[in-house]
């Protein structure tokens, strides 16, 4: 089973206030892209990339020649080959994101073809349950407190606090942000 085509499916929608600088977005609403790998036998796999279609398309221009015609059933070897071949093209950033999406899609294909859950293919289940966490943007102390309280009300007991004003205003604001998060 060979890789025939790579398709990009941009996801569009609003972004949370404070998540991105408008100068970076310039009207762009696509910050997440699905990567679809299509095989010569019609089996498809999907991978998810937290990067715009524009950047992933640019990365594909570099790595796609190493994909078309390659085995769709050996994700580890394919990902390693892509990393090796793209080393001098800017290892990291959009190229690494694109490889990640392709890797996920290839594992999806392998799971479908073998009839196995991907967790088993990756070494088996190690936990029966997982503890989900809420992901919130770091914000001014009062806004952060409101976001954390909302997450607690929705049942989350752990949080990942993303980027924001930390280190950008002053030490007093930073201390307040940490204090609110610890409460």
Q: Where would I find each of the regions flagged by the language model?
A:
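Metal-dependent enolase-superfamily TIM-barrel catalytic cores that perform enediolate-based chemistry
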Residues: 128-183
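Residues that line or immediately flank small-molecule/substrate-binding pockets and catalytic motifs
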Residues: 10, 51, 163
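General structural feature for long, well-ordered alpha-helical segments within catalytic domains
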Residues: 59, 74, 78, 98, ...
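Solvent-exposed alpha-helices and their adjacent loops that cap or buttress functional pockets
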Residues: 26-29, 124-126, 183
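Structured beta-strand/loop patches that form or line metal/cofactor-binding pockets in enzymes
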Residues: 1-47
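N-terminal small/glycine-rich loop or linker at the start of catalytic domains
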Residues: 41, 89, 113-137
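Metal- or metallocofactor-binding catalytic centers and their adjacent structured scaffolds
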Residues: 38-113
């Amino acid at each position: 089973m060979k890789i025939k085509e790579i398709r990009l499916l941009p996801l569009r929608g609003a972004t949370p206030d404070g998540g991105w600088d408008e100068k970076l977005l310039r009207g762009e609403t696509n910050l997440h892209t699905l990567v679809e790998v299509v095989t010569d036998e019609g089996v498809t796999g999907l991978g998810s990339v937290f990067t715009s279609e524009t950047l992933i398309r640019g990365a594909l221009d570099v790595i796609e020649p190493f994909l078309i015609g390659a085995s769709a059933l050996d994700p580890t070897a394919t990902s390693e080959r892509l990393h090796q071949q793209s080393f001098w093209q800017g290892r990291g950033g959009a190229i690494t994101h694109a490889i990640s999406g392709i890797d996920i899609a290839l594992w999806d294909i392998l799971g479908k073809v073998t009839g196995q859950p991907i967790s088993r293919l990756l070494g088996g289940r190690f936990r029966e349950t997982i503890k989900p966490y809420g992901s919130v943007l770091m914000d001014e102390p009062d806004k952060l407190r409101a976001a954390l309280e909302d997450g607690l009300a929705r049942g989350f007991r752990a949080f990942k606090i993303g980027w924001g004003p930390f280190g950008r205003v002053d030490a007093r604001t930073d201390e307040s942000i940490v204090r609110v998060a610890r409460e």
